[in-house]
């Protein structure tokens, strides 16, 4: 099996741009994941985010998690299939931030997370334009496709997770296998404790921890908009007996009322090869369905949305 794709973004500026773009396209077509190094986010900022995240978990969340899970380990044989061995909270950035409302964060932590989110947003839009270039779409098409009808903005937020040592890793997953419902996911993960895996060709493959990297993975909405040229893939977090794994997954998703459908240019390009197979829907409707079916295959979700597509038949497509 090929090695996990790592993209050096500095090479996009020189003579190796074409080869680097090809690597990105191959990663999107065959992996649904790739890892960015030498990106635009300062390593000093990433170090601060990591320090503050780990301090916050230790001070405010670790004991709560231990107390919550202690009793559940006893019934693990019954409950493990419906539980994830993770401690999380969620920060919303767009369309309206809730950062000031998150309890127990210091002013320093809020300031650093705000700056980090701004850098991630710019990086997400840069990556989306790289995808547009590879797909032959107009620059900015994916950003426009993600824009909410009302706000003109995407939905953007960060899931802050810690995966503590697990005494029964044979029974618990850190996070059960799933595809991500949204658009583009940017992950800043622990560079010391592994655990993230993706499903490729029927085998679980480790996503290697690398210092100061950002892992990119594609969500279900990218699969729909690209008419299946790029696909979301199943991934999971494996619980570990040693070490606490930090994970900050930032989701650059469509606005809740954004209308999602295959890009007409891609449907036309592939018309001779296959028929359009992906539905047209409002993103919020998909999220409502996903909430109850997250840990199941994505294909039945797409089928349900196809059946509901008549409800949005009168909505106008985005033009290229």
From Swiss-Prot:
Binding site for Fe cation: 178, 180, 235
Classification via InterPro entries: DIOX_N, IPNS-like_FE2OG_OXY, IPNS-like_sf, Oxoglu/Fe-dep_dioxygenase_dom, Plant_2OG-oxidoreductases
Keywords: Ethylene biosynthesis, Fruit ripening, Iron, Metal-binding, Oxidoreductase, Vitamin C
Taxonomic superkingdom: Eukaryota
Keyword Metal-binding: yes
Names of required cofactors: Fe cation
EC number: 1.14.17.4
Residues annotated as domain Fe2OG dioxygenase: 154-254
Pathway assignment: Alkene biosynthesis; ethylene biosynthesis via S-adenosyl-L-methionine; ethylene from S-adenosyl-L-methionine: step 2/2
GO process annotations (BP): ethylene biosynthetic process; fruit ripening
Recorded GO MF terms: 1-aminocyclopropane-1-carboxylate oxidase activity; L-ascorbic acid binding; metal ion binding
The keyword Kinase belongs to this UniProt entry's keyword annotation: no
Catalytic activity: 1-aminocyclopropane-1-carboxylate + L-ascorbate + O2 = ethene + L-dehydroascorbate + hydrogen cyanide + CO2 + 2 H2O
Family membership: Belongs to the iron/ascorbate-dependent oxidoreductase family.
Name of the molecule in the record: 1-aminocyclopropane-1-carboxylate oxidase
Gene (name only): ACO
């Amino acid at each position: 099996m090929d090695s996990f794709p790592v993209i050096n973004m500095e090479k996009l500026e020189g003579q190796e741009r074409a080869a680097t773009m090809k690597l990105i396209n191959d990663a999107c077509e065959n992996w649904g994941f790739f890892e960015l190094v030498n990106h635009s986010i300062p390593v000093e900022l990433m170090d601060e985010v990591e320090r503050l995240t780990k301090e916050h978990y230790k001070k405010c969340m670790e004991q709560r998690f231990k107390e919550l899970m202690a009793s559940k380990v006893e019934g693990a044989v019954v409950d493990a299939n419906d539980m994830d061995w993770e401690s999380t909270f969620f920060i919303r950035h767009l369309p309206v931030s809730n950062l000031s409302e998150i309890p127990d964060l210091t002013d320093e932590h809020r300031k650093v997370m705000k700056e980090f989110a701004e850098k991630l947003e710019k990086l997400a839009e840069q990556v989306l334009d790289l995808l547009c270039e590879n797909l032959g779409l107009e620059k900015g098409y994916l950003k426009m496709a993600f824009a909410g009808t009302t706000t003109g903005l995407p939905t953007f937020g960060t899931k802050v997770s810690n995966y503590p040592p697990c005494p029964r890793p044979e029974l618990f997953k850190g996070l059960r296998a799933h595809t991500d419902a949204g658009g583009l996911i940017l992950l800043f993960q622990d560079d010391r404790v592994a655990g993230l895996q993706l499903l490729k060709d029927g085998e679980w493959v480790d996503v290697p921890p690398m210092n100061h990297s950002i892992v990119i993975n594609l969500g279900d909405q990218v699969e729909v908009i690209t008419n299946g040229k790029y696909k979301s893939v199943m991934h999971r977090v494996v619980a570990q007996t040693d070490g606490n794994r930090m994970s900050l997954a930032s989701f650059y998703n469509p606005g809740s009322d954004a209308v999602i459908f295959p890009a007409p240019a891609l449907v036309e390009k592939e018309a001779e090869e296959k028929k359009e197979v992906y539905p047209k829907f409002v993103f919020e409707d998909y999220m409502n369905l996903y909430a109850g079916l997250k840990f199941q295959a994505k294909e039945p979700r797409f089928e349900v949305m196809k059946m509901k597509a008549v409800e949005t038949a009168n909505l106008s497509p985005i033009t290229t």
